[in-house]
Every structure is written in C-alpha cells, then in structure tokens.
Amino acid sequence: MTTTRVAVVEKILSANDRLAEQNRARLDGAGVLSLNIMASPGAGKTSTILRTIEALRPRLRIGVVEGDTAAVTIDADKVIAAGMPAVQINTGGDCHLDAVMLANALPQLPLDQIDLLIVENVGNLICPAAFTLGTHFNVLIASVAEGDDKPYKYPGIYRGIDALIINKIDLLPYVEFDMNYFRRGVEMLNPGVITFPMSCRTGEGVTEWAQWLAEKVKSEK
C-alpha cells in the first residue's frame, strides 16, 4: 500500500470515528444502550435478534437497524412483524456499515421509546471491524458450522469485541468443531471476553444472554 493510499484510508477512518462519537452522544442523550452485531453470513444474526426480542420484550423496548448489501427488507420485516421498530440500511454493495449510515438511520427511530438498540451489521468478518459506529458494545456471533479456526484466520474482529455468542451449539454432535481449540484462539486475542454458547433453534443459552443485556441496560440508566 502506497503512502498516499495509507493517508487517504487514515483520513476516512478518522472522519468515521468523529461521526461515531456524535452517534454515541446522541444515543447517550436518549438513554439508549446500543449493540453492533457482527458475524459472517448465515451465522444467525437475525435469529439471535429475534430470540433477544422474544426474551426481553416484557422488560425492554428494543429497536433494530438492519444492514444489508442489497436493496431488500427481509430481516427488517421480520423484526417489525415481531412488534419492534426497525430501519433497513442498504449499503449498495459495501461490505460493512459505517457511522454515516447509522447517523442517517437514527432519526428514523423513536429513540425516546427505545431502551436497547441492536444494529445488525453486514455479514462479513473483515470490514465491519475497521469502522466504528458509535455503539456501546461490539458483539460477534460465531456459528459452530463455520469451523473452529475463525479466531486464527480473522483475528481483527475477535480483538475488538465486548461479547461473543457461539451459536448453533445444537449442531455440535454433527460438525467438526473443537470447542477447546476455538476458545484458546479467542482467549489469545481477547482475554476474558464474555462468551455465550447458544442455540437459536432450541433456545439454549438465550436466557443467559438476555439477562446479561438486561443488566447492561439497567447499569446505563
């Protein structure tokens, strides 16, 4: 990478970070705790969000921002059908959301009626790690069906997360996934990161995840 290109990239990221700070200030001002959910395609981002809504609906008011590369509203429609407000962001092919996109989405949500905002980033294990959004927590969903080597192959995204969901654990008897090997990789990159083994299909582990979230929202109020 040339010196000129490095300077341009740094300028873009710096501008993004400044706007991310404004997003955080806006969310803080509204008393909204926010999550940036990242994962590869098919890991279960939307399923996790729907399970979270189901578990926390009696206690928390939840809003969702859905990010997709194509002009579709499939996931946002599911959230709305579950009774929660949602905004769809179509990136036009970009492999990640950025602070500008979230800044444009926030005015479309009733922030004064939301306790927890969940942002579903574009399915990708590289690009989303580089662009801060201004959310309070970064959460990664890793599906056991993806294999146990992902922390070793995509270290950047694992280093920057605040919580890790290991999804689809109901498939462990049927796939080659060494949990100890996977956890060693995670621990090497992000020592002590809180981890939630979960199955969105069976509901196993959802209660623990939802309780952690509820406590985080309460502590921010």
Language-model features and meaning:
Residues 128-135, 144-192:
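Conserved C-terminal guanine-recognition region of P-loop GTPase G domains, centered on the G4
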Residues 3-25, 29-38, 43, 47, ...:
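Nucleotide-state-sensitive switch-loop elements of NTP-binding domains
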Residues 171-220:
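Canonical P-loop GTPase G-domain recognition
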Residues 90, 142, 199:
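Residues at the C-termini of beta-strands that transition into short coil/loop
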Residues 68, 167, 199:
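Active-site glycine-centered loops adjacent to acidic/histidine catalytic or metal-binding residues
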Residues 48, 98, 150-153, 178, ...:
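Residues at alpha-helix caps and immediate loop-helix transition turns in enzyme cores, especially N-
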